[in-house]
Amino acid sequence: MLSVIILAAGKGTRMHSSLPKTLHTICGEPMLFYILETAFSISDDVHLVLHHQQERIKEAVLERSKGVIFHTQIVEKYSGTGGAIMQEDKTPIPTKHERVLILNADMPLITKDALAPLLESQNNAIGLLHLADPKGYGRVVLENHQVKKIVEEKDANDEEKTIQSVNAGVYGFERKFLEKYLPKLHDQNAQKEYYLTDLIALGINENEKIDALFLEEECFLGVNSQTERAKAEEIMLERLRKNAMDLGVVMQLPSSIYLEKGVSFKGECVLEQGVRLIGNCLIENAHIKAYSVIEESQIVNSSVGPFAHARPKSVICNSHVGNFVETKNAKLQGAKAGHLSYLGDCEIGKNTNVGAGVITCNYDGKKKHQTIIGENVFIGSDSQLVAPINIGSNVLIGSGTTITKDIPSGSLSLSRAPQINIENGYFKFFKKP
């Protein structure tokens, strides 16, 4: 086994946001949680080093995971990546295991498989990337698969600038290596910071062997700006879409479909173009038609859309919800709502038909109220159901009716004013042609 230290102390100034960088989301999930999930898949000893907005990050983490060990970087004294793993006396932060893997919190695309070279190595090692265009990166000079030296681009000679091996920002160390060289680390550089790369240089100077392990570039994309966040999200989306299609989900124009990490599929599902699945959703034996949005809801044995919106806590089972229908905290069981309706805070029973333009008036300006509709109910078009209201089964509601009282089962309900036709009434407003 090994211990994992995740570095998350940076300010993330290039994100231009008051939200801590690591809490920015990738497909609905804060990017920090991706790396924590990977860390816990390989270790029972996970450490998180914080500084900037640490209480906010700690609170977010504790809502999801109780197993993380938190540390605060002493930035005022030991800044930089090397300083992140130092205690007050320059010794490494204590870990449970002899081998330590160091990761960055702003790399949400890292997977257990991508870390395999570092996990399998028993030596001190640095993860490398092979970049076609390494401009802007420090170069790693190799000799017989060992690190000879690490050169910052501004210090590289012409030959070294042609090197395409760069530091991926992940490391595997023996704890005794950290205990030996971390106290020797200094900040005698332009930035006045302690660097993990300098730690490696100290080891090389004393003939320590540092393995150079090449990793998959895509998985080690660092997120330091909104542009890089968007790029990482595109890659994650491709993974989520592929995972869904591997389960048999049919996607029409997959590149137009957005889904988040919390979405799960069962049975035979079809997603048409422009569909958005947000939060923790269950899509089971369902057809989600074009440009529909499903948020934190369950769609089971049903069709939804096109242009429908299932807002949080909607449970749509054995039902049809058509175009321009919005649901919110609604439970439909064997019902139909074909078009142009708002169904909020309601329960609708089997074989009930909701006509076009029907609205559940669930909000009185202060509180939300519930509408309960039984089975075999026909609600005529353009009716309003003013909650709280209870409509029994086998009920017929005439078109244009405003319901303000409970309706017993077996009833016909109407509330329209009589129609009046006034002869020549038009010409009271307009001149005769």
UniProtKB/Swiss-Prot annotation:
Positions with a binding annotation for Mg(2+): D106, N224
Swiss-Prot/TrEMBL keywords: Acyltransferase, Cell shape, Cell wall biogenesis/degradation, Cytoplasm, Magnesium, Metal-binding, Multifunctional enzyme, Nucleotidyltransferase, Peptidoglycan synthesis, Repeat, Transferase
Chain sites annotated for binding acetyl-CoA: A356, N362, Y363, S381, S399, R416
Similarity comment: family membership: In the N-terminal section; belongs to the N-acetylglucosamine-1-phosphate uridyltransferase family. In the C-terminal section; belongs to the transferase hexapeptide repeat family.
Pfam families: Hexapep, NTP_transf_3
Organism field: Helicobacter pylori (strain HPAG1)
The protein's role, per its UniProt record: Catalyzes the last two sequential reactions in the de novo biosynthetic pathway for UDP-N-acetylglucosamine (UDP-GlcNAc). The C-terminal domain catalyzes the transfer of acetyl group from acetyl coenzyme A to glucosamine-1-phosphate (GlcN-1-P) to produce N-acetylglucosamine-1-phosphate (GlcNAc-1-P), which is converted into UDP-GlcNAc by the transfer of uridine 5-monophosphate (from uridine 5-triphosphate), a reaction catalyzed by the N-terminal domain.
Name of the gene encoding the protein in the UniProt record: glmU
Protein name, UniProt field: Bifunctional protein GlmU
Co-factor note (free text): Binds 1 Mg(2+) ion per subunit.
PANTHER family linked: BIFUNCTIONAL PROTEIN GLMU, NUCLEOTIDYL TRANSFERASE
